[in-house]
């Protein structure tokens, strides 16, 4: 893909000719790093405070491995670059839940993930924390989940595509069902975006992923 196809990206959001970031980009990255760090620290503090009174409700629910299988755009603009993502995730139960005697209801959990994002010949480490609301069986065999959280990228520019900065908002929707005993199979939709914090020309991406999980 040629840079000339996206002149606005080259003009406003790419480094200068000597490879240095513009003052606007430096300021944005500085602010986003501190904002993302503050958000993560605040969320961790909330979890620690909660665990003191609800420690019996917290625990590892499942581990999963995921890989992107489709690049169909659902939200936002089409990504000019093609991406692959592979990651592992751990789901921790949170104390807020309500299940009926039949074993069906709603719950909450925290999804923590780490993986590799690959595009335009470049690789990036991606870590995320996403609180989720779940609907399904209490044993986790059948689950529908929806979550909004944050992710940190070790790099935010891939070829002509600029995600905007190291911090990205994450929107996720997933569904899983039992495959064999404690093993499960699921589908996950992930959307990364900086919500135009860094300007109107940044572009996020959608990820349709297959997910294998193991329930504890």
Stretches with model-predicted labels:
Residues 59-67, 104-112, 127, 142-148, ...:
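Transmembrane beta-strands of outer-membrane beta-barrel proteins
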Residues 66-72, 111-117, 149-151, 190-192, ...:
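Outer-membrane beta-barrel pore domains and translocons
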Residues 90-94, 133-137, 177, 214-216:
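Residue-level signature of outer-membrane beta-barrel architecture
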Residues 52-61, 94-106, 121, 138-143, ...:
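Short loop/turn motifs that connect adjacent beta-strands in outer-membrane beta-barrel proteins
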């Amino acid at each position: 893909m040629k840079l000339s196809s996206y002149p606005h990206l080259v003009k406003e959001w790419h480094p200068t000719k000597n490879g240095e970031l513009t003052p606007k980009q430096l300021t944005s990255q500085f602010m986003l790093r501190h904002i993302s760090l503050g958000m993560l620290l605040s969320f961790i503090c909330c979890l620690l405070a909660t665990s003191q009174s609800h420690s019996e409700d917290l625990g590892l629910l499942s581990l999963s491995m995921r890989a992107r299988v489709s690049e169909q755009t659902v939200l936002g603009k089409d990504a000019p670059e093609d991406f692959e993502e592979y990651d592992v995730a751990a789901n921790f139960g949170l104390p807020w839940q309500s299940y009926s005697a039949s074993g069906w209801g709603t719950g909450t959990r925290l999804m923590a993930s780490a993986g590799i994002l690959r595009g335009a010949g470049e690789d990036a480490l991606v870590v995320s924390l996403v609180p989720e609301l779940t609907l399904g069986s209490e044993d986790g065999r059948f689950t529908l989940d929806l979550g909004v959280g944050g992710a940190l990228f070790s790099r935010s520019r891939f070829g002509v595509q600029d995600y905007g900065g190291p911090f990205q908002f994450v929107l996720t929707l997933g569904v899983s069902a039992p495959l064999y005993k404690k093993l499960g199979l699921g589908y996950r939709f992930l959307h990364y975006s900086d919500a135009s914090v860094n300007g109107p020309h940044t572009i996020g991406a959608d990820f349709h992923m297959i997910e294998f999980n193991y329930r504890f």
